[in-house]
Curated annotation (Swiss-Prot):
This is Xaa-Pro dipeptidase. Its cofactor is Mn(2+). It catalyses: Xaa-L-Pro dipeptide + H2O = an L-alpha-amino acid + L-proline. Its EC number is 3.4.13.9. It comes from the Bacteria.
Amino acid sequence: MTTLNAKLASQYPAHIAQLQQMTKSVLSRENLEGLVIHSGQEVKAFLDDNCYPFKVNPHFKYWLPLIDIPNSWLVVNGEDKPTLIYYQPVDFWHKVTPLAESYWGEFFNIKILTKASEVDKLLPYDKKGFAYIGSHIEVATALGFEAINPEPLLNYVHYHRGYKSKYEHECLRQSNALAVKAHQAARNAFLQGDSEYDIQQAYLKSIGYGTNDTPYGNIVALNKNCSILHYMSLDKMTPQVHQSFLIDAGANFNGYSADITRTYSYKNDKFAELIARMDQLMLNAVAGLKPGVSYVDLHIETHRAIGQVLRDFNFINVDADTAVESGIISTFFPHGLGHHLGLQVHDVGGFMADERGTHVNTPAEHPFLRTSRVIETNQVFTIEPGLYFIDSLLADLKASANADQVNWQNVDEMRCFGGIRIEDNIIVHQSHNENMTRDLGLS
């Protein structure tokens, strides 16, 4: 057993015990006997026999690191050893993944399913007391489930998913280690003058990934394309001049996601100075992640800090407080500061005040925040402030009553660079923050 597997093996029992206790509590509360969690199944494109890439149910991979096996099931009740119904068909068309020995296998009663259509033989006979958790409602209905994705139950689980176990922390460190290695390869490709497409290939090759292995579609943008927040076009043509490079790209380990962003300037110029300033601003925001602090308040503080950057670089003609009051900062920073991170890139539970799912509203002037929850120990966040020169938003500002608050000549000079986003992945501990991304060597 490798050192990493030994560490995971030592941490996994406590993780399973935590899930068992959580399941027992929510089943008692909702007067249910158990949960039947479906890994999912392949979905065919319309009028086609080809399937979309399979993406496992996050509630399934919460229990065990099986992320590419459709038609599998978990039956859990919080007390007995969970049952894993593992799909292993006899199939000469496709590769079948046998169930290998692992550190987690002993925690499950394992049953092999050879035909997906015969799963009912292995599921509880009387399903009245069981809730189906998964996306295939038609399958659940056909099998006779009455309780399908009950909202109170999901609220409870989603709220508690905000707190990560030590096992989950280690999985997130490993996904960050992969992403850091790939980011370094991508940076080198940019500096040698590659195209967006070739940079993407360098990223994937460095960690042995295919296109569908990343937890989300990589954003690999050069020059003005850096102003498009979710740019995914991957131009194969090399630009005549390399000016800027923004990469927002992650990796996956055991179903847990890394989500890292970096921005680079090709030259040591004013844009490079702006990147350095935004990098320090990002680290200041990381330092503000403390138990008991509202993430909304941290976003608002960072929002004002970006206003100060705009003033210091003479992009605006007013002080930061005036820029906050007038609302012009949102033109340059139009998204939220970050989000919870875990089994999903934008992990669940970010807007919940309690395990009942009580919603915590975001301020009307900050509609794109992805979390409004109070920060607590063992939570994991991204911190990703940005500063962009987006033509459509700048046009709206220029046509507004606040146009005279902007130094348009200086702003126009930056349009060719697109924008800046810098994003790290952080574990909040009781006495300190663990910046996984920086600790693993990505500056």
